Amino acid sequence: GNQFAESVLREQLSQSNLKPIDRHMVQEMVFGVIRNMILLDTWIDEKATRPPGKTRARTILRLGLYQIAFMDRIPEHAAVHETVATARDLRLHSQSGFINAILRGFLREKAIFLKRLEDWKTTQANIAYSHPNWLFKKWKKQFGDTEANKILQWNNQIPSSYARWNPLCG
C-alpha cells in the first residue's frame, strides 16, 4: 500500500532470523536497487530481447544486477547463482533461464556497462543517477546543466548514518 520501503523492510527484517550482518546486506541491496532503479532497468532492457514488464522477474533481475555491479564483497558467480535460486524459490521456474542468461550476459560485458555508466554521468545523468527525465529537465532549466548534475549526484548518494547519545535518556 502506502508504506515507505524503509518501514516495510524494517518490519520484514524484524520477523526474520537473519544475522545482523545479513540484515545489513539485505538492506543495502533493497535500498541500492531503489536508488539505482532507472539505471538497472536500462541495463535490463538493453540485454533482454524481450524485456520483462513490471514483474517479479524484473525485480529479481534488479537485485542480481545490483549485486554484480555494485557489491564487490559478493562473488559474481554467487550473485548469479543466488538470484536464479531466488527465482526458482518464488516459483518462477520458466523465467529462471532468462534471468540466468541476462545476468551472465551482463557479467561478460560488465566492464563495458560500467564504462558507459561513467560516460552517462555527463551525457545522460538522469539514467546514471536514476532520476526521471522530466525532473532532470526541470532542474536543468531551473539551475543549469552543471548544478542539475550535482543535484542528481548528491540526491543519489548513500546517506550517511549518524548516532548520537542523548543525555536526557540516560
Walk through the language-model features, giving the residues of each.
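Class I Rossmann-like S-adenosyl-L-methionine
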Residues: 1-170
